[in-house]
């Protein structure tokens, strides 16, 4: 499946194959040709400006913009051959960068194979059509004699240079003109050629202010985008279009009714899906369902059409080949009549993988590229990246974040303060912004209208106007209320065959990568076809964003923008002072508004002679004290941190509370922080109704079940709609407040530093030179203190935003939903009574009980189920895991305790032992009454509700069950962890983890005795089994409205539907004990036992699992720490049926087949352990370290224990090697005068989840001789063998799934005995 990226120079001659003269689709038949380059299969690069549908004047910079962020214009860009050559080479480099990462390669592979359907909604049913603009373009071929012929080619994607705006990349599907209307096959399932306008050299910049990270520093929050990620963003749009899934039917429309609201293009659902992250939640669930259903119906129509195709306008097209391609593309099945049909299970996987699998956010993580946290993150002017072809600036594996230049951590390579060599600011007439003018009258008016951006205005004594210009980016995006669907409030009719809606749309990029690695390569068909010789192609008209004037607003009072402007310092170094009067600062360019009284007093007094350094220190101390202010308010208990100076900093006031921000906040709540208060009332939610009844009992019960499921859907739909409104109308305002406060603190710091610099300039004390470094250190400290203040501000805004969501919007929604429940329950009860004669009295009582139970508890809104919108996803998972932990057993100083914060009490009985665990110590339980640990749960973590979700996780080590024990005790089920509550009627209720032979069992039982179980049956091959003496990580999630899921080592192993269970009245105690175990010699070890108050999702489980697997300590075969001076047997992971043997002392080692054991009756087999050579690891240089653990990166010597002696392993200088590369290792070699290279490094270079180790060998100059592995070869007259060698070859193959340099170190252990 490797993808080849072709390399070109623009001057390369046309070859009618990979370099052609293209007549693009919008020029087809007009004899207008462009030089085009086939960068890879079915993708072409045309190094020309995208001019289709434009006018020449569109390329010239306008005076202003109608809407949107800043734009950069240059009509001369990409007009010369040298420009085109640089563009072409840059695109080749970006494609190589994308291809070099498996996630990017998978994206390219899907695009290459997503061939547009040869036809569309308007083409003939029974015929493929290759002449349509949507699938082909013409080209002009020239033979050696100079004669030309016109041909045509089928393709998927054509990439041009940028259109009029250099920093505006766009993807357009081919538009067909049908019946005087525009028709888009890319939106109808068929797909079409996709055209991209792209510029790699001018990239957007953005802020990371709302990320709550400690590395954030004032002045260092701006980043520039990586053009590879910009290209992948557009390629995701291409993928959607090729599959006919490009979304056009829904947009988030910006409100523009107030002057502080951004003038922005409507944001399409297509754009939000492509960006990903939390912003995709702006698209409500009912809209997502509608889009899903539309594509499903489109594909059904295509399946029907494909079934009828029998011919093509081009007789050379292989119809059967294309049918197979489309069957695979659309994942169609065939019915018994050979007709293509949509398999809805396959369709759901396909749809989710295309629409939700690839996103900018997820690809950024895979490529280690910094990108915006939110689609609404603060954007700034674009910058130029002039040296993308310079590998020291940008390479095709790391991009800008080059580790060797110390630019990898914290994305320093993209940081505008750190990597200044990588970019150039753009300015001049080419840079155009959407500006808003705010003008305020000052004393008696004059005709003066001055732009005070540069602080050069001087007003006359007669007065005038103060006018400031504000960039559109500085305004707040707030969505119109009609951007959100009201479908969840509409009436719905339920019947026995009602189809439930999917409530979650997502797909893991990791799953796509796994599927890509497993799939076989598709054979692409011939891309040549017949040309169109005449035509009048249609190109849609370019919509210009140019404006000729700046929008001006007259205001009477100061706004936040006057407050921020009054805090800006002059650009030149001069004497300035600080003032607490905004108006004073606005009319006097040497005065800076500040809201820190002590700072104002200190800086204005100036340096006092030789006390200069102390004056600076005092300023820093005052700034620290005032900027770190925070408080709490009892009435707003869910906001833990309130920053009181935000009010005077941003002009946040309430009438009657001027100068008292805290008082105003206490009176009004967090709504005070909003400029625009959205409407939180919801339309009435129509009660569910039931279709005409059936007399069949099964259908009646199914109708009732569907009704209850639909009721659950309704709650979730309304919650998600409310969350979408919050994201689009409220959360953007709180995020903007954070940006505004960041800017304010930045201005405060800048003013203080300039005052210090000016005072230092005029300072003439004798210590002036000596204190220079200290002054700089103190100024840096000033930035650090502002950064800490910013963290408090982010917490304040984040929690205030959540508070408004939960206490205002969700509470209002719950009122409506409870009314909906009341009406719907009455309808359902009436339905049951009306049909009681068909279902019987007994069933009637059960159903009534079930309905009362369901409707008695509202479905909770859990914020933890929604991504935090203020921190990045990786940090968010850590936060979720920490906040949702309600029990966490830890062992410290040999005492077992709960460290979750809920302080459950723990009783440890005498025979509950402590042994080495996965990290630290673990609980070891043997089979007697006093080997027991009891956790008495805190009251806060009771689970006496049928809607409480939870997760149990722990590490488990169980000895291998021998064949004799399996025969004797194989039917004995015994619990190891239990929360079962015993009632007087002997009906247990709760949950338990138990073992039975080779099976692990999870049991849930409700108080009525209903039971659900998941049984994991271990592998018959005990060497690879989970429950055979290795440490394994067990996670069981329980979603009470869905299923219980059992994971082992992060992999789903079993599920059980649990929606039918009632309340689980579990015991107050959790008991860790071997209960009802018949084998007196049985034991288990348990480590890191935790309970979470939510059903963890797969990504959270993966993060939890890997968090325990530190690569600091290497591990033996069982998962215990690898130790020095301990005997181990070595097993190669890639050849696990082999052992290591030695030919002779001083000679080589090789692999032999290990003995095996098979028991057909019990279905057990495995390779026996403890055979072959024994190895011992010793420190390369003895030291006084107390612990005996081998750490990754330790330098070691490896010995073989042979005939009661220890013999060192190494490679003699100039020794034998296969191909002069694979150096043959020797044991006990000791030839006079020939040094033995024996220095090794124990490392973990790959596969964190496997308990394997790699060994790296060095020569006497510390040069690598390679990793220890095997080579199949022959030495002398010996037979062909797998011989142990050291080879550098392995370093180039570390990404391979199986590699011969991975080794298991197997110590003898009581938990494994060979049968």
UniProtKB/Swiss-Prot annotation:
Its EC number is 3.4.24.68. Disulfide bonds join 439-467, 1077-1093. One of its GO terms (cellular component) is plasma membrane. The active site is at 234. One of its GO terms (biological process) is proteolysis. It catalyses: Hydrolysis of 76-Gln-|-Phe-77 bond in synaptobrevin 2. Binds 1 zinc ion per subunit. Zn(2+) binds at residues 233, 237. GO terms for molecular function: metalloendopeptidase activity; protein transmembrane transporter activity; toxin activity; zinc ion binding. Its cofactor is Zn(2+). Belongs to the peptidase M27 family. The C-terminus of the heavy chain binds to ganglioside receptors. Tetanus toxin acts by inhibiting neurotransmitter release. It binds to peripheral neuronal synapses, is internalized and moves by retrograde transport up the axon into the spinal cord where it can move between postsynaptic and presynaptic neurons. It inhibits neurotransmitter release by acting as a zinc endopeptidase that catalyzes the hydrolysis of the '76-Gln-|-Phe-77' bond of synaptobrevin-2. The precursor polypeptide is subsequently cleaved to yield subchains L and H. These remain linked by a disulfide bridge and are non-toxic after separation. This is Tetanus toxin.
